[in-house]
Design a protein with these regions (language model features):
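DNA major-groove recognition helix of helix-turn-helix/homeodomain DNA-binding modules
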Residues: 43-58
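A short, Lys/Arg-rich alpha-helix, primarily the initiator
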Residues: 1-11
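Short, basic-rich loop-to-helix N-cap that marks the start of a DNA-contacting helix
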Residues: 37-47, 65-66
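Alpha-helical residues within the helix-turn-helix
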Residues: 10, 21, 50
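Short, charged recognition helix plus adjacent turn
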Residues: 60-68
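Short alpha-helical DNA-recognition segment
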Residues: 14-29
Length: 68
């Protein structure tokens, strides 16, 4: 799943550490989310969206995989 987390975080002038602290997660979690190595739980996705005042869909972009 793609996301705009890094773009949104930087636009707000936040460091990964600051966002992680606000969401009660590790900086490594934020880094992994931004790099697309980790998909958030639904609870974390809601927390991120609420923190930024956006919808989940404005941050996370779901793309269906094409079947072979």
């Amino acid at each position: 799943m793609k996301n705009r987390l890094e773009e949104i975080r930087k636009a707000r002038g936040l460091r990964q550490e600051e966002l992680a602290c606000a969401l009660s997660v590790s900086r490594q979690t934020i880094s992994s989310l931004e790099k697309g190595r980790y998909n958030p739980s639904i609870l974390l996705a809601f927390k991120i969206a609420r923190y930024f005042g956006l919808t989940i869909e404005e941050i996370f972009i779901y793309e269906e995989e094409e079947e072979p």
